[in-house]
């Protein structure tokens, strides 16, 4: 810490504190997205994506037996939402000073310190109760990848856009994968298809 060279500036405005709060909000925004992505990727097991398997921290849903609720994702996203609200309050407080005096520092300080504490606790719980126990679901990932119609894009250089679109439409209409649709239409044999769509080399 050091003494300011311009006391009037710091009494009239708390820009630096507002900047600190904005950085906390940016972190909260990133964590909010991460928690929502995990929640979507772990949805299932039959009607969702189910490419991630999350720990079962609670007995399950009180309504649906056997259901695994993404409680840690929900908890973290609620904390992040609260912090976004705190940041908005800080920005209003920082803009609300009167001439050479901003009397909103107690609100600003409270929101910053509370946000740090809330986010720190939420991150710790998220790591211990979800991240360390999360697992990939290779079987479902492979199934979803093989059934993805978007892979048809890789066939365009070989057979052209129109034929590739025809393959995608047939695969969708008959609930078959792209390889089966391609062979059925006679545009490529199995070996040529595997050479064109090699998912191991697409990343």
For every predicted segment, state its role.
Residues 1-203:
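Conserved, well-structured ligand/cofactor-binding cores
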């Amino acid at each position: 810490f050091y003494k300011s060279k311009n006391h009037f500036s710091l009494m009239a405005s708390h820009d630096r504190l507002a900047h600190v709060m904005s950085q906390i909000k940016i972190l909260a925004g990133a964590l909010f997205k991460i928690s929502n992505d995990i929640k979507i990727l772990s949805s299932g097991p039959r009607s969702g994506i189910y490419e991630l398997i999350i720990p079962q921290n609670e007995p399950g849903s009180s309504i649906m037996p056997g259901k695994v609720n993404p409680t840690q994702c929900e908890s973290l996203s609620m904390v992040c939402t609260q912090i976004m609200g705190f940041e908005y309050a800080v920005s209003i407080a920082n803009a609300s000073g009167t001439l050479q005096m901003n009397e909103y520092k107690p609100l600003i300080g409270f929101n910053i310190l509370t946000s740090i504490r809330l986010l720190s606790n939420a991150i710790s719980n998220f790591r211990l109760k979800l991240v360390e126990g999360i697992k990939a679901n290779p079987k479902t990932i492979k199934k979803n990848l093989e059934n993805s119609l978007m892979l048809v894009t890789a066939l365009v250089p070989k057979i052209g856009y129109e034929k590739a679109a025809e393959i995608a439409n047939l695969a969708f209409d008959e609930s078959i994968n792209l390889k089966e649709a391609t062979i059925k239409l006679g545009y490529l044999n199995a070996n040529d298809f595997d050479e064109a769509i090699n998912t191991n080399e697409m990343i």
